[in-house]
């Protein structure tokens, strides 16, 4: 079984990137899985390539590096989709570049997508934060579904889906949402509207490092607007 995790590098904060890589290095990979990771980097970030390679040198994971000539998350996500269309992966995933994943994340994702005969699995994102006000904001805006609940959309901070979905070459992220965000929610909502089954996996957890910009109320308001 071939699986690829896609990570779009959008920040230059090495502290968060190192934490992400360290968690990937600790990830439990079932014996029947061949795992690859694809990093999508803007041209001006490509110097990170050697740094990432060094961090993974003791782990037997095939690394892929994709470059984009212009910034913008939807462009990076579409670059990854194009790459996956040319490969024979069974499942592909998106994770954020500032998130740490639980050691059992991959096992839990594979287990549920098979047992529920799902097309797409979404999961929760926890947050490293001590401020009680910030914690309350996250409780308001973050999805809180039951385990195995059928849902209508997922986010690219924690998702795994069947690569066969990409046989439809029209499926892509909307670049018109580059400046406002929300292209991932719209992408997976569209797939749900086409009949694809999306299930919530409460046991496959990722944890986000909190950026200073996200401690401000205006950031929460904008994010809540995107979530609807």
Regions inferred by a protein language model and the residue ranges of each:
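Glycine-rich, basic loop-to-helix element that forms the pyrophosphate-binding segment
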Residues: 67-86
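Short beta-strand-to-loop acidic/aromatic patch adjacent to the donor-nucleotide binding site
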Residues: 89-100
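Catalytic beta-strand/loop signature of glycosyltransferases that borders the donor
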Residues: 198-210
């Amino acid at each position: 079984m071939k699986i690829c995790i896609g990570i779009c590098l959008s920040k230059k904060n090495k502290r968060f990137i190192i934490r992400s890589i360290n968690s990937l290095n600790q990830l439990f990979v079932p014996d029947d899985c061949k795992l690859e990771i694809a990093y999508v980097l803007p041209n001006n970030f490509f110097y990170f390539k050697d740094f990432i390679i060094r961090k993974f040198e003791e782990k037997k994971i095939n690394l892929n590096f994709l470059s984009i000539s212009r910034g913008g998350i939807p462009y990076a996500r579409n670059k990854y989709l194009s790459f996956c269309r040319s490969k024979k992966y069974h499942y592909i995933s998106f994770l954020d570049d500032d998130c740490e994943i639980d050691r059992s994340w991959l096992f839990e994702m594979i287990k549920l997508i098979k047992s529920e005969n799902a097309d797409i699995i979404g999961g929760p994102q926890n947050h490293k934060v001590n401020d009680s006000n910030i914690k309350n904001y996250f409780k308001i805006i973050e999805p809180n579904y039951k385990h195995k609940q059928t849902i209508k959309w997922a986010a690219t901070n924690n998702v795994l889906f069947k690569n066969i979905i990409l046989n439809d070459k029209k499926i892509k992220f909307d670049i018109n949402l580059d400046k406002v965000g929300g292209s991932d929610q719209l992408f997976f909502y569209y797939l749900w509207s086409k009949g694809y089954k999306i299930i919530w996996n409460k046991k496959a957890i990722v944890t986000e490092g909190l950026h200073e910009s996200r401690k401000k109320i205006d950031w929460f308001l904008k994010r809540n607007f995107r979530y609807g």
